[in-house]
Structure formats: structure tokens, C-alpha cells
């Protein structure tokens, strides 16, 4: 009995004491590659948490210009903590430099040579996330200016101790609170891991408390990190799906948003206003288009405060999102084959499952962009569907590139919903979104009986828009993002946008739309009222966020200088962009707005176009029909025999005919509208 008691006392004394573990010395190569200096940790409590965990990291590094260096700590579960990146100016060396969460002086405000105690750029307490302390930790060092001078790691050590700094304590918030428990696991890129979520929102004007029950939703989810470049940032964005007790995805409404299973927590790390995405989606919604609904919230993961996030709807087919028909592998003919499809121009990363190249190069001479499958994905589409959607897009591009592209019937207009393309252009050019036409550029196609055209949108991904990018002219008030000039970039803008602007119909219509919107929802008064109201809602939580992530007044890729040191400063910076960019577009957006009344009373010759051509079962007729007027249609075969005859009312200049299963070959379509006649030819497979 006494021996057991003595052993327990010895073990508890051992655990209660600080313990340090060191790495070996070694060269820091001058090659721009991360070099790992492993630290083997053993004999500690299995779980690193607020009772016993990582307390400090001390390093000794020699290098003639330490501002060349990026230094991180990588935990056994893959969590990466930024210690110091590109700090120190022209000074040298880190000598007996120790990082503590509790020190007031931040390393990025210090001067080289660095010695003594500093607060790291990240937070050490994020390592104490209930992961197993025992294992291999890595000090990662990269010389970001290769080919100049090398350095040397003279040793480093990690100290684990009782009661380390446990982070920021969130007690209550005016925003919804999200608690996530991953059961001690790190959150990977892929696949999703199981977790449990509590979403708390007590309603307008009510405070939400960290101890409240999850009254909006409480239950299992699958969660992963998401994004491309954003995966490298300290504050991660997450994708998650809501699951039932058996692990199957299940649709659930969240904080006033329609029921669905797939959602996103956007970290908004580079956008310190937390508003650039939201402003863009708000504008799209005000213009009558679908864009992701959003709600700001504060998140705690495994007991650790993570800051402000934006809960977003993921772009997805569905009645509450992109409202197009469900396309199944069985839909291989007739109207069922014609929709719905979601496509995009985007990076070839992440969950890309195929696509096809544009038929024509971009106007700047760069690489030809690809059109990628989003819904259904390339693994689900069957050959007939792939052939159909590719041929439709090819027909659109051929019509747009052709010499008669401005023609109402022979050009591109029958293939696209023009007004959706105009709204997409306006939103992305107002924001001068340098990614907007070449990355995360979504469009979709409806079934023929629902219009059948290519609809541009939803708009997506504006973190580095609205003047928040210091490259490719993203912070320059003048110019257009669809005239992207960087030919060395792997992702280019399709030729569509330049060509569309060469059509007076399109540019004049876009100009009229802009002028109309500037008198209302896009006026400075309306936009500033929205921005100010959102900033007021976020004001309490932003203070906590920027203690957790102390990046105000600090460069974060790709913020342009100067870097405002207050939240009010970054909000004013956004409003300045709105003022200056809108003024520039007022003066420079192409086109002339011709009042509708000037076109009234003109006699228009009857013209008609049949598409698609070749046709399958359904045929659309587009013509200069009077709205609601009765149009008589006859279809003849090559022998002159009448195969089909009926009268239909015209709607928006279009008529859908379903002639049935007649012989294949060339068909002549005769159209009568009042005392005017016209014909069209179509080949039917």
C-alpha cells in the first residue's frame, strides 16, 4: 500500500514539474525549402490541455539577415504555429530567444538581433488542443530569399509545464456562438473527420453565452479545412456537413437559412473587415440574383477561442441555393438531358473532377482556360451529358466568336441569360475582383423548359477584392479585372468578357443597368449604411478576434499598404474604395444608356432562329415576336410534307415547340406572326 502511494506521489510530482526537450543543431539551407528540426517528446501526459501542456519555445539561430527567415512549430497532429516570419529588418540572429503567449511584446515589433522573451506571431496554446503531447514535434525553418546567404540552427527546446496559458475565454457574445468538439483530433484538409457542434443563437437583441445549449443545432458533423492558398494561413476556413446519428448527411436549417447539409465557416483572415464577401453577396441578392446567405459568428474549437467566422451556404444545387433541376445518370435524352448543370472557371485543385478547354484562347495571349464540372461532378456525369453540355458551351463560344456575334438570332444571345452576365460583370468590376473572371467563376444551365440558357453566377470569393490585393492591379482604382494582363498566370479570363463588351447591345445594356443601380442600391449612401450597420454589429467581437489574431497594422497576404491599425481604419479603407471605384466606373464604364422610349414605335422585321441545331426532341424558336402575340408554326420535311402545325403565344421573344418523333434530317420551320412570315432550318438527329 505504501509503495503504491509513494509511486503515485512520485508520478504526480513528475507530471507537475516543467520538462524541456531539445532538437539537434543543423544547417538552414539557402534554398527556399522548409527544413525540419525534430524534437522527440516522451513521458508526458497523453493529453496536452490547459492543465499541462506546451508553455514556451526557445531558439538559437544564426543568420546574417533574419528577415529572410520563416520559423514555425509543427505539432504531432499537424497543427502549425507561426513563431516568427520575415521579422528583424537588416539585423542578424535569434539568440536565447524565447516565445511565450503571456509576454506583451510581440516578435514582429522587436528588433534584431533578437534576445529575451517575445510573444510569437501565432499562439502556442493552440498546441494544447487535447492532442497527444508525446511524439515528434518539428521546428520548421525556411530561408525565403534563396541564393543569398545561409544560416544555422544552434539548438532549440520546447518546455511543457502545468497550467500553461489557456487562451482567450469567451463568455458571451452578441453574435451566434459555435462550439466544436473534434474529440482531440486535428482537422485535416481531407477527408472530413467526425465532430460535434453546438450552434447557439438566442435571437435578435439577446446575448449568447458559451454555456448555453445548442438551440439552433446540436449534433454530429463532418469537418475539414478548405480553400487553396488560404490553407496556408494560420486561421483556417472549414467546410462541414451536418450528419445524423448514423453518419449520413442530413438537411438542417441554420440561423434563418434554408435547410441544407453542406456549409462553410469562412475565416476571413486576409479580409480584416469580415465584410468583403458579405458585401458582394448582399449586392448580388439586392440585384435579384441568388448568392450565398451568410451570418457572422464566433467559434470555439476544443475549448479554444478561434475568432470571428462567416457561416456561408456552399454553392450547391437545390431549391434554396442554385435552383436548377436535379440531373441523374438516367437523364440522357429529351428535356431531362438539358439541365441542370453547374460549371466553373477555376483552379485545377481541390475536388476538381474534369472538364474541357475553352475553344479559344484569352485575348491577352495566355494559356487557354478550362471549363470545369461542378454539378454533377465528372465522376457522376455520363457520356451523353458530357457531350451535351460541352456541345452547348462550344455552340455558345462559336456564336460569340463568329462574325455575326452581335446578331440577336445568329449571335450569342440565344445561348445566355444576358442580364445575369451583366450583373456578374458589374459586381466583379465594382469590387475589381482580380480572381472574379478566372478563378471561382461559376455559371449554370437550366433545362430547356425552364429557359435553357447559361446563367452567370453565383458570385463567389471576394476576400482579396474591394482593393485588398497588392498585385495584378487589385489595389489600383482604375482599370478592369476582366482585362487581365498577367499572361504568366496559370488561370486566365475566357475571351467571353472582352467579346461581350464589343457588342453595343451588351455594353449599352450594362451601362443602363449600372446607372440605374447607382441611383439606388449601389449608391454610396445605401452601401455606406449597410457597411456601417454591419461594422457596428461586429465591433464587440472584432476586439476579441484581433487579440486572438493580432494582425491589425500588420501585413497579411496580400494586403496593400498602408495597414490600418484599428478596425475602424480597415472599415474606412473599404468605404474609400467604394467611393473612388464607383466614381471611376461612373466616368469610364463603356456603353451609352439609350432610354427605352427612343426605341418605341419602330417597325421590326420578323426574324427567327431555331436552336439547338442540331436538335433532339425540343426546339426553341427565338424571334422578333410581340410579347404575347399568337405565332403559327409549321414544320416540313425535305419533301415538303407538313409534319407539325400549331399556334402558340410568344413569351419574351421565345417559343418552345415539341414536334414529336418525326423522321430525322433537315427540317424547314415556317413561322407566321400577324402578316409577317419567316423561316428557319434545323437538322434533327
Q: What feature does the model see in each segment?
A:
Residues 1-22, 598, 620, 666:
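Bacterial Sec-dependent N-terminal signal peptides
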Residues 4-7, 602-611, 615-685:
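C-terminal outer-membrane/trafficking sorting elements
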Residues 19-167:
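Loop and turn regions of beta-sandwich accessory domains that flank beta-strands and are enriched
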Residues 71-73, 139, 158, 180, ...:
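Residue-level detector of buried hydrophobic side-chain packing
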Residues 165-167, 587-611, 626:
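Residue-level detector of functionally pivotal "anchor" positions at catalytic/ligand-binding pockets or at interdomain
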Residues 166-274, 279:
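Conserved NTP-binding catalytic cores of kinases and kinase-like/nucleotidyltransferase enzymes
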Residues 173-176, 185-188, 193, 227-229, ...:
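Middle-to-C-terminal accessory/interaction subdomains
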Residues 180, 241-247, 253, 258-267, ...:
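Internal "kinase-insert"/substrate-recognition segments embedded within catalytic cores
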Amino acid at each position: 500500500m505504501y509503495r503504491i502511494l509513494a509511486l503515485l506521489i512520485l508520478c504526480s510530482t513528475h507530471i507537475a514539474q516543467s520538462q524541456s526537450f531539445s532538437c539537434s543543431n543543423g544547417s538552414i539551407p539557402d534554398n527556399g525549402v522548409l527544413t525540419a528540426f525534430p524534437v522527440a517528446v516522451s513521458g508526458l501526459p497523453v493529453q496536452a490541455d490547459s492543465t499541462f501542456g506546451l508553455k514556451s519555445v526557445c531558439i538559437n539561430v544564426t543568420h546574417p539577415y533574419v528577415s529572410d527567415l520563416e520559423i514555425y512549430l509543427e505539432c504531432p497532429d499537424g497543427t502549425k504555429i507561426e513563431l516568427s516570419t520575415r521579422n528583424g529588418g537588416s539585423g542578424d540572429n535569434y539568440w536565447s530567444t524565447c516565445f511565450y503567449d503571456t509576454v506583451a511584446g510581440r516578435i514582429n515589433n522587436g528588433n534584431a538581433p533578437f534576445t529575451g522573451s517575445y510573444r510569437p506571431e501565432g499562439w502556442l496554446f493552440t498546441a494544447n488542443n487535447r492532442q497527444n503531447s508525446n511524439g515528434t514535434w518539428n521546428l520548421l525553418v525556411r530561408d525565403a530569399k534563396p541564393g543569398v546567404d545561409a544560416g544555422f540552427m544552434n539548438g532549440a527546446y520546447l518546455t511543457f509545464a502545468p497550467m500553461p496559458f489557456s487562451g482567450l475565454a469567451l463568455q458571451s457574445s452578441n453574435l451566434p456562438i459555435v462550439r466544436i468538439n473534434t474529440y482531440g483530433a486535428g482537422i485535416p484538409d481531407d477527408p472530413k473527420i467526425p465532430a460535434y457542434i453546438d450552434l447557439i443563437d438566442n435571437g435578435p437583441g439577446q446575448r449568447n453565452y458559451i454555456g448555453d445549449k445548442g438551440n439552433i443545432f446540436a449534433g454530429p458533423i463532418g469537418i475539414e479545412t478548405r480553400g487553396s492558398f488560404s490553407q496556408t494561413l494560420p486561421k483556417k476556413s472549414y467546410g462541414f456537413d451536418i450528419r445524423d446519428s448514423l453518419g449520413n448527411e442530413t438537411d438542417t436549417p441554420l440561423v434563418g437559412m434554408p435547410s441544407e447539409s453542406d456549409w462553410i465557416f469562412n475565416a476571413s483572415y486576409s479580409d480584416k473587415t469580415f465584410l468583403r464577401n458579405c458585401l458582394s453577396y448582399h449586392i448580388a441578392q439586392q440585384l435579384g440574383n441568388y448568392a450565398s446567405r451568410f451570418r457572422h459568428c464566433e467559434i470555439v474549437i476544443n475549448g479554444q477561442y478561434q475568432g470571428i467566422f462567416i457561416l456561408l451556404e456552399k454553392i450547391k444545387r437545390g431549391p434554396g441555393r442554385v435552383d436548377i433541376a436535379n440531373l441523374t445518370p438516367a437523364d440522357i435524352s429529351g428535356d431531362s438531358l438539358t439541365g441542370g448543370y453547374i460549371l466553373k472557371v477555376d483552379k485545377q485543385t481541390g475536388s476538381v473532377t474534369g472538364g474541357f478547354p475553352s475553344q479559344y484562347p484569352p485575348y491577352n495571349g495566355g494559356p487557354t482556360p478550362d471549363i470545369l464540372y461542378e454539378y454533377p461532378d465528372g465522376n457522376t456525369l455520363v457520356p451523353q451529358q458530357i457531350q451535351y453540355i460541352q456541345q452547348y458551351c462550344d455552340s455558345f463560344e462559336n456564336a460569340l466568336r463568329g462574325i455575326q456575334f452581335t446578331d440577336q438570332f445568329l449571335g450569342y444571345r440565344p445561348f445566355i441569360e444576358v442580364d445575369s452576365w451583366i450583373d456578374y460583370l458589374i459586381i466583379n468590376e465594382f469590387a475589381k475582383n482580380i480572381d472574379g473572371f478566372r478563378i471561382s467563376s461559376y455559371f449554370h444551365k437550366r433545362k430547356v423548359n425552364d429557359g435553357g440558357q447559361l446563367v452567370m453566377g453565383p458570385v463567389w470569393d471576394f476576400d482579396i477584392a474591394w482593393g485588398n490585393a497588392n498585385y495584378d492591379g487589385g489595389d489600383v482604382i482604375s482599370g478592369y479585372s476582366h482585362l487581365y494582363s498577367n499572361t504568366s498566370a496559370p488561370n486566365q479570363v475566357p475571351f467571353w468578357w472582352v467579346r461581350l463588351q464589343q457588342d453595343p447591345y451588351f455594353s449599352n445594356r450594362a451601362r443602363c443597368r449600372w446607372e440605374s443601380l447607382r441611383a439606388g442600391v449601389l449608391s454610396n449612401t445605401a452601401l455606406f449604411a449597410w457597411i456601417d450597420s454591419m461594422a457596428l454589429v461586429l465591433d464587440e467581437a472584432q476586439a476579441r478576434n484581433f487579440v486572438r489574431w493580432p494582425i491589425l497594422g500588420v501585413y497579411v497576404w496580400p494586403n496593400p499598404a498602408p495597414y490600418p491599425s484599428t478596425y475602424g481604419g480597415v472599415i474606412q479603407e473599404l468605404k474609400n474604395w467604394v467611393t473612388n471605384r464607383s466614381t471611376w466606373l461612373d466616368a469610364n464604364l463603356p456603353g451609352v444608356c439609350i432610354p427605352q422610349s427612343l426605341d418605341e414605335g419602330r417597325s421590326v422585321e420578323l426574324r427567327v432562329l431555331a436552336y439547338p441545331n442540331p436538335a433532339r426532341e425540343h426546339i426553341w424558336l427565338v424571334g422578333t415576336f410581340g410579347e404575347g402575340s399568337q405565332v403559327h408554326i409549321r414544320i416540313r420535311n425535305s419533301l415538303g410534307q407538313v409534319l407539325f402545325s400549331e399556334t402558340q403565344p410568344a413569351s419574351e421573344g421565345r417559343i418552345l415547340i415539341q414536334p414529336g418523333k418525326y423522321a430525322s434530317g433537315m427540317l424547314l420551320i415556317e413561322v407566321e406572326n400577324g402578316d409577317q412570315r419567316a423561316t428557319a432550318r434545323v437538322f434533327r438527329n
